[in-house]
Each structure stands twice: as structure tokens, then as C-alpha cells.
Regions:
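Conserved beta-strand/loop scaffold segments within soluble protein domains that form the structured core
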Residues: 27, 31-36, 40-203
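Short, Gly/Pro- and small/polar-rich lid/capping loops
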Residues: 1-39
């Protein structure tokens, strides 16, 4: 099957209130959007602690080069051990970057809403990097949705780093139509006394 691959950002008009409606009522989160694997440049300014960074992966590589280089592609397996991750590393241009520094608690869950919308069959690659410092805490809810009826083949990789005594809850909810196929690779590097809890649900 032939798929289109998007290797540059194509801006799409997205009204979060109209395009995406969460089925979970009374859910209070800090929401951010990606569209076809790219950070949505219309994301609202999040109400988060000043020290916390939530932005696109491409933006993080420019604004925070030292932090980015210290963690990016350090926890996923090397290419000869996992061809799908190697494919993601080669083609992924963007995604979500989260940094919670030492002793900081992200009070609201971060909701990453990954939307797929295209006018033709699409293959997408998204790379996410989440870094929690010492004693940091965060909850991340990832919601995957399709907005158009074309075929989608998605290859996503997420790397997570937890410093000493850090705690993270990670939830992934996949709510996509039957013509969407998704490969999610999640790799976690944990330090002493850290805790990582993960739940994945496909609807």
C-alpha cells in the first residue's frame, strides 16, 4: 500500500473545542495538540510552573540544546536492535517535549491529544521526550484520535527519563477507526526510588 509521508509542517486550522471533545466528563487537564505527528502551533499557553517546559520536540532542540542532547535518543534501543524505532528516528521531525525539573510537581495532568487528519492515506512518525528531575511528579494522558476516514499507519516512539525519587503516571487511550494502525514504542529510564505507572487502553 502507498502512503503519503509528511516531512514538513503543514499548518491546519484546529479549534480544540469543536474538533476534539473528550468523552470523560469533568476532566481537568493541561491539553496540548499534535496534528499528524507535529506540534500544533496554535496550542494555548499552558498554566504551568515557570520552570516547567512543554513544547514541540523540534522547538526544544533549538531552545534547549544541552538538555535535548543529554536525553534525546539515549533510552530507545540502538538501530540494529529495533528497526521500527530506527525508522522513527530517521523520519520523525517533531512531537512533544516535556521537562519537569527537580522538586517540581505538575499539579494538573498533561493531556497530549494526537490528532490524525489528512486528505489521503498517511504514514506518520512522532517522537516524544519526557524528562522528570529528582523528586519531580507528573501525570501524562495521551489520547490518540482520527478525524478523517483515510488509512493511517503511525509509528510513534516515546522516551521517558525519571530522576531519583521521581514519580510518573502515564495513560494512553487509543480511539481510532479501524483503518488506522498504530505502533507505539515506549522506553523508560529510571533512577533510584523512582516510580513509573502505565496503563494503555484501546477503544
Amino acid at each position: 500500500k502507498d502512503y503519503n509521508v509528511v516531512l514538513k509542517y503543514i499548518r491546519q486550522e484546529v479549534d480544540m473545542n469543536e474538533t476534539f471533545r473528550c468523552a470523560v466528563t469533568d476532566l481537568v487537564t493541561t491539553p496540548v495538540l499534535t496534528v499528524n505527528g507535529w506540534w500544533f502551533d496554535g496550542n494555548p499557553v499552558a498554566e504551568i510552573p515557570e520552570e516547567v517546559v512543554i513544547c514541540g520536540l523540534q522547538e526544544a532542540s533549538v531552545k534547549y540544546p544541552d538538555l535535548f542532547a543529554k536525553h534525546y535518543n539515549h533510552y530507545a534501543p540502538v538501530a540494529h536492535r529495533d528497526g521500527l524505532v530506527a525508522l522513527n528516528t530517521a523520519f520523525a521531525q517533531d512531537g512533544v517535549f516535556v521537562y519537569v525539573p527537580d522538586d517540581v510537581v505538575l499539579e494538573r495532568p498533561l493531556q497530549i491529544i494526537n490528532l490524525l487528519r489528512a486528505k489521503a492515506d498517511l504514514m506518520g512518525f512522532q517522537r516524544n521526550l519526557i524528562v522528570l528531575g529528582k523528586n519531580a511528579r507528573a501525570t501524562v494522558l495521551v489520547c490518540d484520535h482520527t478525524l478523517s476516514e483515510h488509512d493511517f499507519l503511525i509509528n510513534n516512539t516515546t522516551e521517558v527519563y525519571l530522576g531519583p525519587n521521581a514519580h510518573m503516571e502515564y495513560y494512553q487511550v487509543q480511539n481510532q477507526h479501524l483503518r488506522a494502525s498504530q505502533i507505539n514504542s515506549l522506553f523508560v529510564s529510571e533512577h533510584r526510588n523512582s516510580t513509573f505507572e502505565s496503563v494503555a487502553i484501546s477503544i
